[in-house]
């Protein structure tokens, strides 16, 4: 039965590897409780999914889109962008003020004293494995 079903499906999905991906995804959907669009006839889920594809009760494009969506970990949402993004507002407006910026200086001895005061975090059970 499966050989005949696969031969019927090749007309709908030309690439056999893609057919396997789509049919296995549909079989997992059926196992998860998705409604079946044809009579089961005591067939297992992979055969039912192949028969659904062969009978065109499900379109391969819809299955492909559903498969891609199920594999995505992050769905990108288009958000409207603000019309004008202000430049760094904290930057000085006139170029002469750039030379007046002060930076804190630290000597190597100050850095070493600061590092000596740091305490490593306590080891947890997860770290020891």
From Swiss-Prot:
Domain of life: Bacteria
Catalytic activity: RNA(n) + a ribonucleoside 5'-triphosphate = RNA(n+1) + diphosphate
Region (Disordered): 77-98
Record's protein name: DNA-directed RNA polymerase subunit omega
InterPro entries: DNA-dir_RNA_pol_omega (IPR003716), Pol_omega/Rpo6/RPB6 (IPR006110), RPB6/omega-like_sf (IPR036161)
Native organism taxonomy: Bacteria, Pseudomonadati, Pseudomonadota, Alphaproteobacteria, Hyphomicrobiales
GO cellular component, one term: DNA-directed RNA polymerase complex
Free-text function comment from the UniProt entry: Promotes RNA polymerase assembly. Latches the N- and C-terminal regions of the beta' subunit thereby facilitating its interaction with the beta and alpha subunits.
Organism: Methylocella silvestris (strain DSM 15510 / CIP 108128 / LMG 27833 / NCIMB 13906 / BL2)
EC number(s) per entry: 2.7.7.6
SMART domains, alphabetized: RNA_pol_Rpb6
A biological process term (GO) from this entry: DNA-templated transcription
Gene3D superfamilies attached to this UniProt entry: 3.90.940.10
GO MF: DNA binding; DNA-directed RNA polymerase activity
EC category name: transferase
Keywords in alphabetical order: DNA-directed RNA polymerase, Nucleotidyltransferase, Transcription, Transferase
Segments crossing the lipid bilayer: none
UniProt cross-references to Pfam families, sorted A to Z: RNA_pol_Rpb6
Subunit structure: The RNAP catalytic core consists of 2 alpha, 1 beta, 1 beta' and 1 omega subunit. When a sigma factor is associated with the core the holoenzyme is formed, which can initiate transcription.
Stated family: Belongs to the RNA polymerase subunit omega family.
């Amino acid at each position: 039965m499966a050989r005949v079903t696969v031969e019927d499906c090749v007309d709908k999905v030309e690439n056999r590897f893609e057919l396997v991906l789509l049919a296995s995804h549909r079989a997992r959907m059926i196992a998860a409780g998705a409604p079946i669009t044809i009579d089961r006839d005591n067939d297992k889920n992979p055969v039912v999914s192949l028969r659904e594809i062969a009978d065109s009760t499900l379109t391969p494009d819809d299955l492909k889109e559903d498969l891609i969506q199920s594999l995505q970990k992050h769905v990108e949402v288009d958000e409207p962008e603000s019309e004008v993004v202000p430049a760094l507002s904290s930057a000085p407006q006139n170029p002469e003020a750039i030379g007046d910026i002060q930076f804190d200086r630290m000597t190597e001895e100050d850095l070493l004293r600061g590092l000596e005061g740091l305490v490593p975090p306590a080891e947890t059970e997860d770290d020891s494995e």
